[in-house]
Amino acid sequence: QDLPPLDPSAEQAQALNYVKDTAEAADHPAHQEGEQCDNCMFFQADSQGCQLFPQNSVEPAGWCQSWTAQN
């Protein structure tokens, strides 16, 4: 299933400071080097989806402040 890409200017994206490129978040206090969507527990590789944004896909190299390490 193809999900429409999440627009960083969308309200829910802005609420979590989502960016398409993790480098854009380097100055965010919660950001740590190496964190990006494709190594987050909420990322769904088969659809490039995210459990936090169920109606959209996210960039694998993106980031948001809810990033959580995969177990």
Swiss-Prot record:
Q: Which UniProt keywords apply?
A: 4Fe-4S, Electron transport, Iron, Iron-sulfur, Metal-binding, Pyrrolidone carboxylic acid, Transport
Entry annotated with the keyword Iron-sulfur = yes
Q: GO terms for biological process?
A: aerobic electron transport chain
Q: Which residues carry this modification: Pyrrolidone carboxylic acid?
A: Q1
What superkingdom heads the lineage?
Answer: Bacteria
Keyword Iron-sulfur in annotation: yes
> Annotated Gene Ontology MF terms?
4 iron, 4 sulfur cluster binding; electron transfer activity; metal ion binding
- What Pfam families does this protein map onto? HIPIP (PF01355)
Which parts of the sequence bind [4Fe-4S] cluster?
A: C37, C40, C50, C64
InterPro entries recorded: High_potential_FeS_prot, HIPIP_sf
Its function? Answer: Specific class of high-redox-potential 4Fe-4S ferredoxins. Functions in anaerobic electron transport in most purple and in some other photosynthetic bacteria and in at least one genus (Paracoccus) of halophilic, denitrifying bacteria.
User: What is annotated about its quaternary structure and interactions?
Assistant: Homodimer.
Which family does the UniProt entry place this protein in?
Answer: Belongs to the high-potential iron-sulfur protein (HiPIP) family.
What is the protein name for this chain?
Answer: High-potential iron-sulfur protein
Question: What is the source species?
Answer: Halomonas halodenitrificans (strain ATCC 12084 / NCIMB 8669)
